[in-house]
């Protein structure tokens, strides 16, 4: 993944509703979900959901496939994995990113 693709993907995920849509699709796995199912699950109006899905497709994070009269949206798991690899490529100077021995993890943070 190059920098411009990473920026596009991160930009698409930098909006709350789109992040929730993407997480729901990742949770659904390869079978994906229809817009109606996503709308009901996330309580997002159809027109708003359509806009967010278009942005996720444009960023390469989601694919859309017509199945008869329905559209199925699926997470582009390869793209997600490329993004994670891009973000961690230079993590910890090439060493495993694990805490030093003997340290205890602190409480789970909800923000960075």
Question: Locations of the language-model features?
Answer:
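Amphipathic alpha-helical dimerization/coiled-coil segments
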Residues: 1-5, 23-27, 77-112
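N-terminal helix-turn-helix DNA-binding core of bacterial DNA-binding proteins
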Residues: 4-45, 67-79
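Base-recognition residues in the alpha-helical recognition helix of bacterial helix-turn-helix
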Residues: 23, 50-52
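Alpha-helical residues within the helix-turn-helix
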Residues: 40, 57-58
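Divalent metal-coordination and catalytic microenvironments
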Residues: 49, 56, 73
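Conserved catalytic-core motifs of GNAT/GCN5-like acyltransferases
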Residues: 65-67, 97
């Amino acid at each position: 993944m190059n920098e411009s693709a990473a920026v596009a993907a991160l930009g698409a995920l930098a909006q709350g509703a789109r992040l929730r849509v993407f997480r729901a699709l990742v949770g659904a796995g390869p079978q994906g979900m229809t817009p109606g199912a996503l709308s009901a699950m996330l309580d997002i109006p159809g027109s708003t959901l359509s806009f967010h899905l278009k942005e996720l497709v444009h960023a390469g994070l989601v694919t859309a496939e017509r199945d008869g009269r329905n559209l199925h949206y699926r997470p582009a798991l390869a793209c997600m994995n490329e993004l994670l690899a891009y973000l961690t490529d230079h993590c910890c100077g090439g060493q495993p990113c694990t805490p030093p021995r003997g340290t205890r993890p602190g409480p789970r943070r909800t923000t960075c």
